[in-house]
């Protein structure tokens, strides 16, 4: 008899400070798929669910049970209708296909639904109540997961990414799927130890020297006999739940004591390194002065605080305003979220000028207020392109209806749907060659470095006003009680 593996994707990275909710509209803009369609759209795509399919669809002794593939761009709280529907569809699939032999969950690890504090933990608990405690539940996680006690209790194994930028999304999915495969084949019995490290880490790229010693220790532990995985998650501080922060997960083969021992070792190493895990950010004036100097290749300025990939609104005007005030030319900016301006550009038509009140529509304090500009409309597109870089390779990125305009010698991509523009195809698909620009401005914190590093002579990350400040000291927490 074939072994039945329930597979689903239900992802959200929740920034509770963002006023835009993770509702049905937000999910439909990105990914909102049911049943067989959830597999058909993820097959051959560089996601965790795509990795599950890659490993198990080759086997004729396994039946993969499709459920849902829900993904929305990071934003505010997930609304109850979305969360409840996802849980109901997963529950229905479990009941209809009972008995289930295993569950592979493609989740982020930092979901906060309205009225709840632990989206994934509550979901895993529901699944456990339905399938019991004897079958494996394994989940790859985002590096920025806030791993809670409930998540660790209800899951058999949790394996977060190792890289930021997240160039190892697919590899981590394969890792989790292969652990499940070995488990079902009787080659391994996963036992996991979990430690919570109550510290809020800034958005910290794993290429920085300060954090490299921790990955060296984790990989040394992972290479030891009896260990399958030794990982730590950075946490996602804008979620503002009681259990935000760093965490450690060590998975061994049927040896809980060994897992506990090595989890203690990795936790101690992290705590010893914490005083060094700090980042200083330059001012906007400093960044623009450096970027405006002549050099070979563009300078990339990343606006981390308006990163849609961390739940920001994507509409801030701080950097564009400063560029225009300083008379800088030759910059290309991706992106400003402003559906009304896109509609105005479409009405004017490509090849014509249009007066815009651009961006800054969410909140003058955070978004900078709208910019009154005269823009030359270069093109209108559907905002879709194929991601060609390593992060989410093969995914169709969708920014909604999009306008490309020239404002005083600077090119600006205006979109209708929020999405982090971490792939250079955001420019190329809109007629802009990134290598030929003096300055590239991107609404991203760290992910941009994976692809933009191919063309940049320098990359500068800023932490300005916005809903996704790069430094955890920038928030007024209501639920978090630990150390920053």
Residue ranges and their predicted role:
Residues 66, 88, 271, 384-484:
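Extended hydrophobic packing segments that form well-structured cores
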Residues 57-61, 95-99, 129-132, 160-163, ...:
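Generic secondary-structure signature for well-ordered alpha-helical cores
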Residues 2-58:
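N-terminal amphipathic/basic leader segments beginning at the initiator methionine
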Residues 184-212:
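Internal, active-site/partner-interface "lid" segment
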Residues 1-2, 58-61, 66, 92-103, ...:
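Glycine-rich phosphate/diphosphate-binding loops that line cofactor/substrate pockets in enzymes
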Residues 6-13, 17-18, 27, 31, ...:
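Active-site histidine-anchored catalytic micro-motif
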């Amino acid at each position: 008899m074939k072994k039945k593996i329930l597979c689903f994707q239900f992802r959200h990275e929740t920034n509770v400070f963002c006023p835009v909710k993770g509702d049905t509209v937000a999910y439909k803009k990105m990914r909102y798929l049911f049943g067989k369609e959830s597999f058909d759209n993820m097959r051959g795509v560089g996601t965790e669910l795509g990795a599950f399919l890659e490993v198990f669809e080759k086997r004729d002794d396994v039946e993969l049970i499709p459920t849902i593939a829900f993904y929305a761009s990071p934003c505010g709280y997930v609304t109850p209708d979305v969360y409840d529907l996802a849980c109901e569809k997963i529950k229905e699939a479990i009941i209809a296909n009972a008995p289930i032999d295993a569950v592979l969950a493609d989740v982020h690890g930092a979901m906060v639904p309205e009225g709840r504090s632990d989206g994934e933990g509550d979901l895993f608990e529901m699944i456990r109540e339905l399938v019991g405690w004897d079958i494996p539940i394994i989940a790859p996680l985002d590096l920025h997961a806030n791993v809670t006690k409930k998540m660790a209790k209800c899951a058999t194994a949790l394996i977060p990414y190792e890289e930021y930028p997240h160039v190892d999304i697919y590899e981590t999915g394969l890792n989790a799927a292969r652990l499940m495969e070995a488990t079902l084949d009787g080659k391994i019995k996963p036992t996991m130890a979990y430690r919570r490290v109550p510290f809020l880490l800034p958005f910290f790229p794993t290429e920085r020297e300060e954090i490299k010693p921790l990955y060296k220790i984790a990989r040394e532990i992972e290479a030891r006999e009896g260990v399958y995985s030794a990982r730590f998650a950075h946490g996602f501080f804008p979620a503002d739940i009681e259990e935000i922060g760093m965490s450690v997960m060590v998975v061994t083969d049927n040896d809980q004591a060994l897992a506990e021992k090595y989890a203690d070792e990795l936790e101690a190493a992290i705590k010893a390194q914490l005083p060094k895990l700090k980042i200083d950010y330059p001012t906007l004036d400093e960044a623009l002065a450096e970027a405006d100097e002549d050099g070979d290749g563009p300078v990339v300025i990343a606006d981390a605080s308006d990163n849609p990939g961390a739940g920001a609104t994507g509409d801030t005007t701080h950097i564009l305003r400063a560029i225009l005030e300083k008379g800088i030319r030759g910059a290309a900016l991706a992106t400003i979220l402003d559906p009304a301006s896109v509609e105005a550009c479409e009405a004017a038509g490509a090849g014509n000028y249009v007066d815009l009140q651009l961006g800054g529509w969410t909140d003058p304090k955070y978004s900078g207020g709208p910019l009154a500009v005269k823009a030359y409309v270069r093109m209108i597109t559907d905002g879709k392109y194929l991601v060609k870089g390593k992060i989410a390779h093969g995914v169709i990125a969708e920014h909604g209806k999009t306008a490309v305009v020239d404002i005083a010698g600077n090119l600006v991509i205006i979109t209708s749907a929020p999405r982090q523009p971490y792939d250079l195809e955001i420019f190329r698909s809109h007629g802009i060659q990134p290598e030929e620009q003096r300055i590239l401005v991107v609404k991203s914190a760290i992910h941009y470095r994976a692809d933009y590093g191919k063309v940049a002579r320098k990359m500068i990350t800023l932490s300005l006003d916005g809903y996704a400040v790069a430094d955890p000291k920038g928030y007024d927490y209501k639920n978090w009680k630990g150390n920053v």
